């Protein structure tokens, strides 16, 4: 009799446990698991943000954003191949900006073509050699935001989409390179029919023996009267691949450090060889 009573109580407990388990909601996966899904609509374009802090950016300073400020853009460069480090770049239809985060592997949450919103309130906006950046404060200048801060300031919108308007690079020529064109710094662009000066069929992108103190090897492109530096990291997946020869079409992010124009590519997929 005791055995029957025990088994009856056990069966009842299992039924109750199953019933309680069924009370939990099924996961929907409608919201991204990373970031802050409470961030609202964008209320400022990237161009407006850069204009608002223009004096701080041009002075290579940094200023905390104290008002409500949300920008939205599409990721056009990230750290997936190692040629970009602890930052990603977003473009909207008005401009582009660097977002610095003291973390690696950002591409896992922010692949190329991913639309994001950045809540700038509480972060800093500043300039480093003319380049506008959203990030944190570092020794009184603009630096990377702490990785623990970042998730509360970013919202992922939808799935990555390579057909986004911002993913269509702007084809540029020598007229692009003027001092008045700072609004387009960090813009995703396309250089057509250019050659890399060092390409001879055997030269590698970024061999260790040629690196500078930043673990970067500089390669060069001449477009009209403008010299463009290709910054190649020795940590890039393609660092020891041969530089393609002949005429090339190259997609990348156009940056500037003081008086030097620099092109950053995320991958060798950004390069199309049109003649050898």
Predicted segments, located by residue:
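Bacterial N-terminal signal peptides that target proteins for export
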Residues: 1-8
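OB-fold nucleic-acid-binding modules
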Residues: 21-85, 89-276
């Amino acid at each position: 009799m005791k055995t029957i009573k025990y088994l009856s109580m056990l069966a009842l407990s299992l039924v109750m446990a199953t019933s309680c388990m069924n009370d939990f909601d099924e996961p929907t996966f409608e919201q991204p698991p990373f970031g802050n899904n409470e961030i609202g609509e964008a209320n400022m374009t990237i161009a407006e943000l850069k204009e608002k802090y223009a004096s701080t950016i041009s002075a290579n300073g940094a200023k905390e954003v104290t008002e409500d400020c949300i920008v939205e853009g599409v990721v056009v460069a990230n750290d997936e191949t190692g040629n970009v480090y602890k930052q990603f770049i977003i473009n909207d239809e008005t401009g582009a900006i660097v977002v610095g985060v003291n973390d690696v592997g950002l591409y896992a949450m922010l692949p190329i073509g991913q639309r994001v919103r950045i809540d700038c309130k509480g972060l800093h906006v500043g300039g480093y050699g003319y380049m506008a950046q959203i990030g944190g404060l570092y020794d009184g200048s603009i630096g990377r935001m702490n990785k623990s801060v970042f998730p509360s300031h970013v919202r992922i919108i939808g799935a990555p989409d390579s057909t986004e308007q911002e993913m269509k690079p702007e084809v540029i020529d020598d007229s692009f390179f003027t001092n008045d064109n700072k609004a387009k710094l960090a813009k995703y662009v396309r250089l057509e029919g250019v050659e890399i000066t060092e390409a001879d069929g055997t030269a590698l992108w970024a061999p260790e023996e040629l690196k500078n103190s930043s673990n970067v090897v500089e390669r060069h492109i001449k477009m009209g009267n403008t010299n463009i530096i290709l910054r190649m990291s020795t940590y890039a997946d393609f660092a020891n691949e041969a530089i393609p020869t002949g005429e090339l079409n190259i997609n990348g992010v156009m940056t500037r450090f003081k008086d030097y124009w620099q092109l950053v590519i995320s991958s060798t997929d950004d390069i199309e060889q049109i003649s050898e």
